[in-house]
């Protein structure tokens, strides 16, 4: 996997963090609304990146479903991961930063680790 997009999905919008192997930042975290046009713009952006891009998001409630479905239908590899796995990943620090950007970055890092094991 050349790029991993970690997506923190909430009602109506998502925060996206894009990383390459070894944690290289592709772009600063950015927000995407759940409208067709914004999701299409996200899909086009992900497809324009060099190499293959894998999207990782938490399997939370029903909010993730339209995002995952849309990106999958656009031909992007999407994985929905149990939120407990994401929560437990990297919990070896005393500093607890809880923002949408930090969550998206954590999901992307988790995806990088998963990709190495594939």
Outline where the language-model segments fall.
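Phosphate- and other anionic-substrate recognition elements at nucleic-acid/protein interfaces
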Residues: 1-118
């Amino acid at each position: 996997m050349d790029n991993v997009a970690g997506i923190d999905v909430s009602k109506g919008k998502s925060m996206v963090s894009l990383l390459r192997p070894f944690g290289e930042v592709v772009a600063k975290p950015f927000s995407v609304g759940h409208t067709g046009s914004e999701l299409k713009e996200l899909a086009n952006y992900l497809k324009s990146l060099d190499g293959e891009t894998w999207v990782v998001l938490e399997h939370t409630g029903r909010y993730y479903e339209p995002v995952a479905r849309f990106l999958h239908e656009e031909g992007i590899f999407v994985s929905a991961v149990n939120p407990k796995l994401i929560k437990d990943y990297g919990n070896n620090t005393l500093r607890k930063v809880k923002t949408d950007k930090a969550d998206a970055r954590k999901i992307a890092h988790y995806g990088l680790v998963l990709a190495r094991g594939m």
